[in-house]
Each structure stands twice: as C-alpha cells, then as structure tokens.
C-alpha cells in the first residue's frame, strides 16, 4: 500500500504529515504513538491531510501520546507550504477541529 508521507520541521517542532486525500487509512491510537516514537520515525505530532470539498484540505492533528489536538500553528505552516507548492497558490484554506 502506497502512502504519501512527509517529515517536516517548523520552528523546532517536527511532524510526520500523511496525505490521505486520495486514500483514507484510519490509524489507531497505538499506531499513532508508534509513528511518533523517537525510536521509530519520531515526531512531536502526526498530521493527517484529508480531502475537503470546499477548502484546500482538512487537517487532523495527533499528539505523540496519541491524543487529538485541535490544531498546531507550526504544523499548519508546514502543510500550507506543501499545498502551496503542489497547487502553485499563495493562500491555502484548511479546516481543523479548532477553526478554518
């Protein structure tokens, strides 16, 4: 199974970003903890990019303990960079559980 994933750093925070706009894969809390484990891939947060009909993307954030986070400014900036390069856009609009 092919999964498009990135490891990025934003002002000292590091993220694993998984693009699920074309293929939806649900991760369990245990899998999220494993991905974030510094002895495996390792990151402060896991970010999932989801397809959104009205906006450029929907974003889900997970802390390294597997808990849900509403949003993360540094992580959102990393995703915005990816999406702006992909779509050649200067502005990106994304949904999070905290806000648009």
Regions found by a protein language model. Give the residues of each.
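A glycine-rich beta-to-alpha transition motif near the start of alpha/beta enzyme domains, typified by
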Residues: 1-100
């Amino acid at each position: 199974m092919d999964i498009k994933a990135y490891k990025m750093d934003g002002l000292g925070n590091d993220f694993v970003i998984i693009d699920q706009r074309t293929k939806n894969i649900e991760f369990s809390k245990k899998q999220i903890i494993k991905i974030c484990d510094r002895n495996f891939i390792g990151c402060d947060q896991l970010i999932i990019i989801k397809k959104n009909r009205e906006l450029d993307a929907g974003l889900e954030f997970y802390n390294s303990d597997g808990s849900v986070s509403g949003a993360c400014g540094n992580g959102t900036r990393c995703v915005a960079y990816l999406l702006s390069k992909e779509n050649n856009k200067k502005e990106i609009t994304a949904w999070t559980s905290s806000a648009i």
